[in-house]
Amino acid sequence: IQLTEQKTNFARGRLIEVVKPAAERIQPHCKHYGVCGGCHYQHMSYDLQLRAKRSILVDQLSRIGGLDGILVNEVILSPAQWNYRNSLQFHLHSQGWLGFQERGSNNLVQIQECFLPEPALDTLWRQLDFEPEMGIERIEVRCGAEEDLMVVLESSGYELPEFSVDIPLSAVHLSPVGEIVLAGDDHLMMMVDKHPFRVSAQSFFQVNTAQASVMVNYLLEKLPLKQNSTVLDV
């Protein structure tokens, strides 16, 4: 390991060589892993990932928050390890291809595969085709409750991009002048534990819909609620 940053009570480094792999070290699922900055734990078994995330939380509570002796329960596993995200955000290269930021830099990595988006999104982003120098900087794709699809085009310029669709979806352009609907609706309907949520193009929503349902039910079970209580996610 080569140290890249040294602080008083922690350090950062980058992997140079694996001399002897740990028993739980596995082959990453994605060919872009290690270069793409999106995923950090694909070299770990899923069980080890959960334990590592819990360990990181305990460390941050203690080292940063000064909270020692806090009981941190085991991490509740996700119903799906892959293809669980209802949204994905790409950067658009000036040559017209989609990419993610390279790990540790602002360079872009051209993406041929990603195992995080829901199946409908995975099909959608591969069908997107952009011309060079469109003035679009970021592309977000979203998937709603009934596999309704949305494409969000973000730019810092004021010019409206040329855009055409061959499949049923909603498209929204975000720029300094505001939000302009190019096709379909300005929102998607998301469903969490049979509760509908109207989510606009600029709204945050939990990216793992199935795990959001698990989280909501866990909180409802643990909170001291009365029959007429109202719970808000804010």
Language-model features: locations:
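Accessory RNA-recognition modules of RNA-modification enzymes
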Residues: 1-234
